[in-house]
Amino acid sequence: MRVFTAILLILLVLLQYRLWFGKNSVPDYLVLKENVVRQQSANEKLQQRNKLLFADTDDLKLGLEAIEERARNELGMIKENETFFRLIPKENSTRNVNN
C-alpha cells in the first residue's frame, strides 16, 4: 500500500511539474491567450479598413461622383466655367506698431 501511495505521489508531482513548468504549461497558455486577443483586435481593425476600401473601390467603379470628388480634392481640378478661389489663412504674427 505504501509503494502504491508513493508511486501515485511521484506521478502527481511529475504531472504538476509538467503542468506549471513544462512545454505548453499554464503560463505558456496564458501568454498565447493574450496574443490571440491582441491579434483578434488587430484583425477587426483591418476588417473595418478593408470594408471601407471595398466601398471606396465600388464607388469608384460605379459612380462618376467619387472620381470627380477625388479629382477636385487631390488634383485641384475644376469644371469649365467654374471659378476657383483659394483662401490663404492670415498669419498670426505680432507686428510692431509705432504709436
UniProtKB/Swiss-Prot annotation:
Source organism (scientific name): Colwellia psychrerythraea (strain 34H / ATCC BAA-681)
Protein name per the record: Cell division protein FtsB
Positions in the Periplasmic compartment: 22-99
Bilayer topology term: Single-pass type II membrane protein
Residues passing through the membrane, by range: 4-21
Keywords: Cell cycle, Cell division, Cell inner membrane, Cell membrane, Coiled coil, Membrane, Transmembrane, Transmembrane helix
Cellular compartments annotated: Cell inner membrane
Coiled-coil boundaries: 29-53
Principal location: membrane
Subunit description: Part of a complex composed of FtsB, FtsL and FtsQ.
Keyword match Ion transport: no
GO CC, any one term: plasma membrane
GO biological process: FtsZ-dependent cytokinesis
Function: Essential cell division protein. May link together the upstream cell division proteins, which are predominantly cytoplasmic, with the downstream cell division proteins, which are predominantly periplasmic.
Keyword Cell membrane attached: yes
Segments on the Cytoplasmic face: 1-3
InterPro entries referenced in this protein's UniProt entry, alphabetically: Cell_div_FtsB, FtsL/DivIC
The family this protein is said to belong to: Belongs to the FtsB family.
Pfam families attached to this UniProt entry: DivIC
